[in-house]
Each structure stands twice: as structure tokens, then as C-alpha cells.
Amino acid sequence: MSKVIGIDLGTTNSCVAVLEGGEPKVIANPEGNRTTPSVVAFKNGETQVGEVAKRQAITNPNTIISIKRHMGTDYKENIEGKEYSPQEISAMILQNLKATAESYLGEKVTKAVITVPAYFNDAERQATKDAGKIAGLEVERIINEPTAAALAYGLDKTDKEQKVLVFDLGGGTFDVSILELGDGVFEVLSTSGDNKLGGDDFDQVIIDYLVEEFKKENGLDLSQDKMAMQRLKDAAEKAKKDLSGVSSTQISLPFISAGEAGPLHLEVTLSRAKFEELSHTLVERTMGPTRQAMKDAGLSNADIDEVILVGGSTRIPAVQEAIKKELGKEPNKGVNPDEVVAMGAAIQGGVITGDVKDVVLLDVTPLSLGIETMGGVSTVLIERNTTIPTSKSQVFSTAADNQPAVDIHVLQGERQMAADNKTLGRFQLTDIPPAPRGVPQIEVTFDIDKNGIVNVTAKDLGTQKEQKITIQSSSSLSDEEIDRMVKDAEANAEADKKRREEVDLRNEADQLVFATDKAIKDLEDKVDAAEKEKAEAAKEELKKALEGNDLEEIKAKKDTLNEIVQGLSMKLYEQMAQAQQGAEGAASQDDDVVDADFTEVKDDDNK
């Protein structure tokens, strides 16, 4: 089998690796660097990728950076009169990495394992797979970045069981995953993250500070000057990196602008203390998902054996200090944060080709999946942090008599009401044979494959007719939405609970009205007319209460009607028991027992 390369398709930088002699090896690009900037530039019809594109970004407005932040959305880049989707731009980066691997291996490469942030949703994963396809790669597997990092870290440590926290702060995304390693099994226990937080944001606080300082001194706003801003971005990124090793750095940008008196220069000394003050809220934002992942895994700080740092931004001293303070543990510095993800992807490639044996990877889905049911409730079929691949089925029914079709509204998120979650897709199961409500059996099955991509099937168990949907990128979750869902779910837990209770109460009351009608019809002349009238009156009172918003009244009327219906049922049961004693002799001669409505049979008819 041909080699399966491992690709870390990053927001700021990308990396490619391959398995050689059972060990992952990072492949250097033609410039001799082991990572390639995720930058694409267009100039006079020519496309440039990587270092060469980044170098001319200052003078070329047709330069695209951080495209990963737009994956899974309908965002478009308009360049030289042509529109490009994020998938197409990402494909150009992938093609560059593919060419690097082919040059090193001396053979054509067609297969790859590509990594994505653990908190990437279905649309973003689909978009990544599409980018691979555009680049001429068969994407054998999409795996989560923290999981890939753990794979690279733990490949030679499978002899002992340990729990590992992977803290992955990249250029544009942030993930925390907790894994259990042992006997070659890499099992993800929980994952959390923020898809709008990364090294770019740390650069931005320095840029904002420099713009402000220059404005104070010269009265000019550099944020309106595109070329000046590109120079500031480069300087900010360099200063951020410098401050990981020194306590102070000089930012010097001559001829950044011009005033009435001539050229203006930017000269600022930035201390590490000032940078930490500017980026304090960003560092604090990384702690929320860290605590959430620990809570979801049900672990305390003492349970964590190792903390692995992934992504260049984890080199920031304040980030390392915050992790140490939060978890009470010194992070492991034995892995290269820029390369470890690609190395893990290469190992997964080796697992696929059979070159790596006795390694099993068990990943999880980051958000709950379900469908909308009666009353606008979100009924979860697959909980978040469920190990994938997985499949889950549940049987539902119709809400009205002779209902010919059901709408399946597929949802992703943590809220209790459908309207508060993200719509992944909708489809319809039609041609349901006429039947009373509650009789048809509709089986809904959710299937998540090893790449975290969702398929939903609805099947009428009566007719065996089924309808399927594969969730497509068009219904994508934006980067902000996925993080907002979990936060909203926590903030609105109490309100959600009350709304859910109200819907449940109304559904129960509605069901009781339906059951009462059926019971009165079934009883016919078997009980007193007065008792039937009493049940009818209580039913009408409940229906009237349901038209209003007084939940206490609905509950009281429901309880009253429930008591009456139970009383009627008891009387009917007693009558049936007496009749059964009379028919016992005849019934005992029949060996076949059939569950059915009881019908009194006269002895004469049986002779």
C-alpha cells in the first residue's frame, strides 16, 4: 500500500510528516523549514503558497491568511475578479504540502490523514475533507489535533496506563482534550474548546497597542493604512515570539507613515510584563474550556499524569504559568508543539496501512446530536463526548391522526429546546399509511463515522420505507456559535428546565385527553352514564386549561382527570376479571395464548 502522509492543516502554519521505519518523520519544505506558513498569495495570475507568499504580504493586497477560520462557512475571497471558497484556498496549501512529501519520498502521494481542531463541527470537518479532495488527496481519516498529539507523545509509552491532558493553542483555534492511554488504546475522555481563540488574537493585542501608542505620539491612525498594518502584524508576531525568551523587546519600524514634517517612524519598547497585561483576558479564556474538559471527564488535578502543550502559542510564558497554576503540574516540554500534530497524523496513517500495529484510537464527538420532537423539544440521541464511530437509534411516532409525513429536524448543541440549538439539516419521511396518532413507528438512527461526519436515517418500521441525509457543509455552525452553545446551555440551564417542564406537562395533558376519549369509547355501556359524563366534563376542563398559561391549573386539572380515568379503568378491570372467571373453563382448553381485547364468549357459541 502506498504511503499515507499526515498533515496538520493549521491556521498560521502547516506541517507534513510520514512514517518511516515505524517512526514519524517531519518533512522539511524546499526552503528547509519544517513548517510552512498557511498563506496564499495571487499575483498576475500566479499562485504563491507558504514562505514566499508570506514575505510579499506587505506589498500584495491579494494575500490570504488564516483561511482556516472560515472553513465550513459560505465565506468567499474575491481575488482578481474571481471568487474562492475557503476549501479552495486550503486545497492550495494542501497541494504545496503534498508536493513537498512527493519530492522527499520520490513517489506520487494520493492518500492523507488530515487533522482538525477537536471542536470543529460537522460542516468544518466536511469542508476539510473537500479541501483534500480538491488537492487531489484521498482523505483516509480526519482526526482531532489533540488526539494526534497524544498519539505522537504516547506511541512509545503504551506499557503503562496514564491520563494525559492536551492543551492545544494554535494560531486561530484552541482545544483541550483529556485522553486515557494504555495497552495501545488511546481513548478520548472529554474535549472542549474555543474556535475563536489563538495566536492571531495575541498578535492583535500588540497591534492595537502599537496603533494606540503611535496615535498618541503622532496623531495618526495607522489602522487605516493597509501596508502599515501588514508591517505591524509582522512586527507584533516577532515581538510575541521574542518575549517568550527575553523580558523586553524593541519594535522598530522606520518610515511607517508620513506627516506634514516628513517621514514618521515607530519606535516602541515592549516588555513581557506589558504584553502579559495586554493579553491577560486571552490567557484567562483558555482556562474555561480546561475546567470544562476536566469536569466532563470527571477528573481532579491529581488524576492527570501529564500535560502536553501543542501549538506555537503555548510557548508564551503567561500561558504556561496559567496551566501550571490551574492544574498544579509542570507541562511536559518533551514534544515539539509545532510538529507533534503532524507526527500523530502520520502515525494514524501508519495504523491505516498496517505499518503500526496494536494501536487503537477512540475519539469523541464534541457536541450533542438529536432531533426536534413535539413541543419544540430537542431530544438528544447522541450525547457530547460520546466515543466515535457510533450509531444510536430511537423509535418515535406521529403527533396527529392519519399523519402522512414526519419532518426530521436534525440538531447539534446542548440546549433543551430545538430553537436554541443549531440546525444541521431537515428532511421528510413521507407516505406513512393512515393510522391513529402514536401508532406508526418511525425509527430515527444517527450514525457518526470515524471522521466525526453525521448521517441520519428515518425509517417507517411498518412499510420499511426509509429516508437518509448526510449533513452537508451548507448548514454550518460558525466558529462563535459552537462555543456559545455550551456557554448558553450553562447560563440558561434553569430557564431551559422550566420550559422543558412546561412542554412535558402540556404533552402529558394532551396525551391524557386523547386517552380519555379512547377510554370512553371503549367503555361504551360498561360503566354508568353519570361516570362517563364526569370524565367528559373533567376532560373539557383540562382542554380549556390547556388554552391558557396557568401551569398550576393545567397540572391540577390533569391530576383530577387522571384520577377519574384510573377509577373507570379499575371498574372495567374488575368487570373483566369477573367475566374471565366465568370463561376460565373454556379458555384453559386452548393452548394458544393471544394478547387481545377481551370479548365475552357465550357458552352456546362454543359448542
From Swiss-Prot:
SUPFAM superfamilies per record? Actin-like ATPase domain, Heat shock protein 70kD (HSP70), C-terminal subdomain, Heat shock protein 70kD (HSP70), peptide-binding domain
Look up the domain of life of the source. Bacteria
Regions of compositional bias (Low complexity) in chain numbering:
577-588
Q: Where is the composition biased (Acidic residues)?
A: 589-598
List the molecular function annotations (GO) for this entry: ATP binding; ATP-dependent protein folding chaperone; unfolded protein binding
Record bears the keyword Nucleotide-binding: yes
Return the annotated region ranges for Disordered. 577-607
Induction annotation: By stress conditions e.g. heat shock.
Enumerate the UniProt keywords alphabetically. ATP-binding, Chaperone, Nucleotide-binding, Phosphoprotein, Stress response
- Give residue numbers for the modification (Phosphothreonine): 173
Q: Output the CDD domains linked to this UniProt entry.
A: ASKHA_NBD_HSP70_DnaK-like
The question of whether 4Fe-4S is a record keyword is answered with no
Q: Which PANTHER family match?
A: HEAT SHOCK PROTEIN 70KDA
Q: What does this protein do?
A: Acts as a chaperone.
What does the sequence similarity comment in the record state about its family? Belongs to the heat shock protein 70 family.
Q: What is this protein called?
A: Chaperone protein DnaK
Q: Which organism is it from?
A: Macrococcus caseolyticus (strain JCSC5402) (Macrococcoides caseolyticum)
